[in-house]
Amino acid sequence: MEDVDLGFLSQEKLDEKDYLDIECSRVGGAPLFIRKNDAAFLNESLENSFEFLMQLYAPKNSEISYHRILYIFINRDGDSQTAGWTRGVKVFREQARETDEIDFQLITSKVTKLIDSSEIEVDAEPKEENKKEIPEKLKNVKVDTENPSAEPYTKAKGDVSFLKFQKRLSRAPDQIMRYYHATSNEFPGLWCNNECIPSSIPNCACGAKRQLEFQILPTLISSMNIDHSAKNALDWGILSIYVCSASCDLANCGLAEELCWLQTFSEQGIIAPE
């Protein structure tokens, strides 16, 4: 059975003291790095158009990943958010052993205005019988009632996937991310469109396979400080984060870059039943 934890935004805002808590998974604020060298490298190499979106404290049960943080940076220009292995989202992994000397560094120059700082609270996904109201953002997807019989096979695929997506989110409409505890890609995650799912996942530079670790949902967009009506506003269906399955030690001597797959909603909309 698929084991999924959900992430929700806390109602309490964070301050700099909270930013210095390595175990605090959060959106917004300033990113905290385990090593000063990693912070300096990122500060110099990351393009100015990228803003800090979130960091997730996700240690693994191994010596080299006693401390393990995943960082997400996103390009504020929505036009850069292309479907597939997008270059508009940057993912980094940083790790340390319990015995390592920790040299924390907060990059205050990367404090983001994109989203207010908030801790990510985690809870297990409710059972299906606990489903609630569908989020307004997902209710407003275009419904095609003009020609329900046209291209039934092609459209049904996307529609079925989106309806499953709606149904799953209805269990906890305020969720902004989904974290998977699977040790392989046997459980493929949640998708809003059958037409844009990765069929081939690049391996890590260490040679190990990458696997889906968590997904960032479109429900987060409504909390972002952006002009939602702008032509190039940030938008996505699902951001799927693929990470080295071995949590290799490349992240113990620097930042290991991982991958993000961006899935968009189907442009065909939902077809009403006959």
UniProtKB/Swiss-Prot annotation:
Similarity remark: To mammalian protein PDCD2.
Residue pairs linked by disulfide bridges in the UniProt entry: none
Gene Ontology cellular component terms for the protein in this record: cytosol; nucleus
Gene Ontology annotations of biological process type: maturation of SSU-rRNA
Organism the protein comes from: Schizosaccharomyces pombe (strain 972 / ATCC 24843)
Top-level taxonomic group: Eukaryota
Protein name as catalogued: Uncharacterized protein C13G6.09
